[in-house]
Amino acid sequence: MINDLFCDISDKLIGTGYFDTVYEYCEIIKRTDGTLRPMYYKSLKAGYVDVQNFDKNGTAYIRKRGNVSVQIDRTATRLTSCTDTVQMITATFPLRLVVAVPKSQLEDSPLVDDIVAAELIGVLQSDMQSTATAMDAVSVVCAVSGYDTDSVTIWEAENKGVLLDETKVYRFAYVAIDFNCEIKGDVTCLQNCLKNEY
């Protein structure tokens, strides 16, 4: 299931010790006051919860940053008999990881945001074969395309109509990492991955 992908990434991120909480799959939501914020869907009863609690001992969230693409991999079509073919697909999820880690818990360095980013990039690009196996996929690969450590730029990309509270944000290493997760498998795998999940 696609849930396995996000739970696995979340577990690996929590393993760094930077975060108390990782929200696995967030969306930018328009609130009743007209502002836009990243929020996590908890349940029908609880609704959406705010993920930008800078009072926490480190927090992180993952959100989609565009449309998921699904392509048929014609070169990977396999014939097992004259009448039986397996159609392979590649689903690419464009994602963004946003983290806030208290600087008081980090090395005292002007490069602290970049140091955090480098470690998290290593986590995101680590081996995902166990996740692929759990999803019944051929492979799962996460590849980072870039990162940002400018607090103002990150805040403005994640929020609309919400003022940046400099007294809070600048006490944290505030990092955004863009990455793609590519899942390869047969069509049945994709159907199973997305069924009744995110």
Where are these regions (language model features)?
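Polar/charged alpha-helical tracts
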Residues: D11, D20, T32-T35, A46, ...
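Extracellular/virion structural assembly segments
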Residues: D84-T92, V98-T131
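Small/polar-rich, solvent-exposed N-terminal microdomains that initiate assembly or binding
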Residues: M1-T83, D136, Y198
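Beta-strand elements of well-folded, non-transmembrane domains
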Residues: A76-R78, L95-K103, F179-V187
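Short, charged interaction patches at domain edges and termini
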Residues: M1-G15, D84-M88, D136-Y198
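Short N-terminal helix-initiation segments at or just after the protein's N-terminus
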Residues: F19-S43, D114-G122, Y174-T188
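A short hydrophobic beta-strand element
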Residues: I62-D73, L95, R171-C181
